[in-house]
């Protein structure tokens, strides 16, 4: 899938951008740019995610149908349908990763991490196993690193049905003695529980933005909050560095200091489905959309209005190049990490990301890292200077 926003069944209010510009005194207005961003990207993304997550978690939806089909002749076809729906859910979640602003970031990102806890630390596979092995689970009482789309990745795509807990963990003590079909069924039931939690979190964030709910939109677009909202937005967009560049590419590939070994496969975001590259693509696509909100405004217009059209064009070109390469790669991040097996391989990877204008035949994922790094370097210097915002904490210096 492309990660596009697609159709949204939830009724959306008309964008307030045009009305904002009618009262603006110049051809470009920062508050109006933020209005377009909120009304045409952020809120529609949460509306789309709410719809997709609700359908995925419904008992009669694709996941529920797969759970019912386990150990029947329809199991394979039902799983294929569930996998397609899961990809749509993951794409919708990955789009929201780039704008974890306000409600999604409140209380230490508690709602965002219910969607995807990747930025909070490693997935607790034992914790997920415990959910699958237990009855009457209160999902809200479970740790965030046992929930979200990574837990679904483990439950639905890990072919090894044995638990990963230590022997003293009582909840999983009899798990390995269960039949294969029983373990698959219980994992599927756990996936349904986690899918419902994702759906609830998505609905909560969407409601918090809407006028009928928490109306965070009004606060976000209040004239006196323009600078704070601009800063919050650019802080969120730095996910491109910490989440996409470093987390999904640099750390597992062993490029940055966060990985102390040759490679760090444990940091791959979606190791069981091998869907991590598509997540990178979706992140790049939504960042590109946020950079150029619509034909009349966006961060591109902001930068051009400040007198730096060449910087705006460079961002667009570099984003286009990175997306083109990412979509052309026919291997997974897991495979690329496994292929870096020696110091000479590591050197080849280093050369690849240091010279991203030439795609490496052996390690195109390292080339992609270099392309994303090029965008991030411009983000940390040109973008923050021209837009007049601060670099968020933790991004002051590069770490590769």
Predicted feature descriptions by range:
Residues 1-15:
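Ser/Thr/Gly/Pro-rich low-complexity, disordered linker/stalk segments of secreted
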Residues 12-400:
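Mature extracytoplasmic or organellar-lumen-exposed domains after removal of signal/transit peptides
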């Amino acid at each position: 899938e492309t990660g596009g926003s697609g159709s949204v069944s939830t009724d959306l209010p008309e964008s307030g951008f045009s009305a904002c510009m009618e009262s603006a005194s110049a051809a470009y207005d920062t508050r109006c740019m933020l209005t377009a961003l909120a009304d045409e990207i952020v809120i529609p993304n949460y509306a789309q995610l709410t719809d997709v997550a609700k359908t995925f978690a419904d008992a009669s939806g694709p996941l529920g149908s797969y759970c019912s089909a386990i150990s029947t002749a329809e199991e394979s076809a039902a799983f294929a349908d569930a996998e397609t729906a899961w990809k749509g859910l993951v794409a919708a979640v990955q789009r929201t990763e780039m704008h974890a602003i306000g409600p999604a970031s409140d209380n230490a990102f508690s709602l965002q991490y219910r969607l995807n806890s990747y930025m909070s630390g490693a997935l607790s596979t034992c914790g997920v196993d415990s959910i699958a092995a237990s009855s009457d689970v209160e999902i809200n009482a479970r740790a965030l690193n046992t929930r979200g789309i990574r837990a679904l990745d483990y439950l639905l795509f890990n072919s090894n049905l044995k638990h990963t807990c230590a022997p003293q963990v009582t909840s999983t003590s009899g798990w390995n003695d269960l039949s294969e079909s029983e373990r698959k069924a219980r994992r599927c039931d756990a996936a349904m529980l986690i899918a419902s939690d994702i759906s609830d979190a998505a609905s909560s964030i969407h409601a918090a933005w809407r006028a009928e709910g928490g109306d965070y939109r009004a606060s976000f677009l209040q004239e006196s909050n323009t600078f704070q909202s601009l800063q919050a937005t650019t802080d969120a967009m730095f996910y491109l560095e910490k989440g996409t560049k470093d987390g999904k590419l640099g750390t597992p590939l062993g490029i940055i200091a966060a990985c102390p070994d040759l490679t760090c496969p444990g940091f791959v975001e979606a190791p069981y489905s091998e869907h991590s590259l598509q997540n990178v693509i979706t992140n790049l696509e939504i960042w590109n959309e946020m950079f150029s909100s619509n034909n009349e405004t966006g961060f591109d217009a902001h930068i051009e209005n400040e007198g730096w059209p060449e910087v705006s064009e460079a961002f667009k070109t570099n984003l286009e190049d990175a997306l083109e390469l990412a979509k052309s790669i026919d291997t997974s991040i897991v495979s690329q990490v496994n292929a870096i097996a020696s110091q000479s391989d590591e050197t080849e990877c280093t050369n690849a990301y240091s010279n991203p204008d030439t795609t490496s035949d052996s390690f195109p994922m390292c080339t992609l890292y270099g392309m994303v790094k090029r965008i991030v370097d411009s983000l940390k210097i040109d973008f923050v200077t021209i837009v007049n915002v601060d670099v968020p904490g933790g991004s002051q210096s590069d770490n590769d």
